[in-house]
Design a protein with these regions (language model features):
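Charged phosphate-binding loop/patch that engages nucleotide di/tri-phosphates or the phosphate backbone
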Residues: 180-218
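Short, conserved catalytic/metal-binding motifs centered on acidic residues
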Residues: 15-16, 95, 141, 211
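Short glycine-/polar-rich loops that comprise or flank the Walker A/P-loop
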Residues: 7-8, 90-91, 124-128
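Short, surface-exposed loop/strand segments
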Residues: 1-88
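Activity-critical C-terminal alpha-helical subdomain
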Residues: 97-182
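P-loop NTPase catalytic cores that bind/hydrolyze ATP
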Residues: 91, 99, 109, 205-213
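Acidic beta-strand-to-loop metal/phosphate-binding motif
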Residues: 13-14, 89-104
Length: 218
């Protein structure tokens, strides 16, 4: 058990390493805007963060499952790393995943294995919410297309590459910037993500890219 005095816990269950980095940077931005601090526990084997504001402390744990197909198996992690380890606080859970298509119906992520995942964690969660990105997380990043171009040193008149997925488009932009320079996912994408205009991404994604479905009154 852990006796640190937290007010509440927030669990992010994310699809891949790039999603983890993106939401880490997004949390940093939100904390900065609200006069809060966010600190990563470098000694923990988990992706563990503490958000502090005045006398309040909020625990954040992020589970990177590797692929959307593995996300439905994450209930074990939630019960072990969150509920059992910090049983004295309430938990809000965010399921962060790609729908893989711009017109994909989010309701399919409430059926089958996904329904069983929600049922297995809902008794120990104060709320469960979906952060569903249409196609790749890179599509979200491309909402700040000018920011991506600036990071790569490309002219601001550079056209958006063709391709169905954002990951394909970003890879093309990296090659256009430098044929020897490749786009890397995960931690190596942090430098790019840190330069992006999160406010702009948030503005665009609220209507076109990220769909946030709430449940249980969250």
């Amino acid at each position: 058990m852990n006796d640190y005095s937290y007010e509440k816990g927030i669990a992010f269950i994310v699809e891949g390493a790039t999603e983890r980095v993106f939401y880490e940077e997004y949390l940093k931005k939100l904390c900065s805007e609200r006069g809060m601090t966010i600190t990563k526990d470098e000694k923990s084997q988990e992706n563990k963060y503490t958000i502090c504001a005045e006398n309040r402390s909020i625990l954040v744990l992020i589970n990177n499952v590797g692929s959307v197909s593995q996300m439905t198996n994450s209930a074990t992690w939630f019960h072990r790393a969150c509920v059992k380890e910090y049983s004295n606080i309430g938990w809000s859970v965010f399921l962060c995943y790609d729908t893989d298509a711009y017109n994909s119906d989010i309701t399919k992520f409430h059926e089958g294995d996904w329904l069983r995942l929600r049922q297995s964690i809902e008794s120990d969660a104060e709320s469960i919410a979906d952060l569903a990105a249409q196609a790749d997380i890179e599509d979200v990043m491309l909402c700040d297309f000018q920011g991506v171009l600036a990071f790569l040193g490309l002219d601001n008149n550079t056209p958006m590459p063709k391709g169905r997925k954002g990951k394909v488009k970003i890879k093309q932009l990296f090659r256009r910037s430098d044929p020897a320079c490749a786009y890397h996912e995960g931690e190596r994408a942090r430098a790019l993500i840190q330069t992006l205009d999160i406010d702009l991404i948030e503005k665009h994604s609220s209507s076109t890219t990220i769909r946030h479905q709430k449940s249980r009154g969250f």
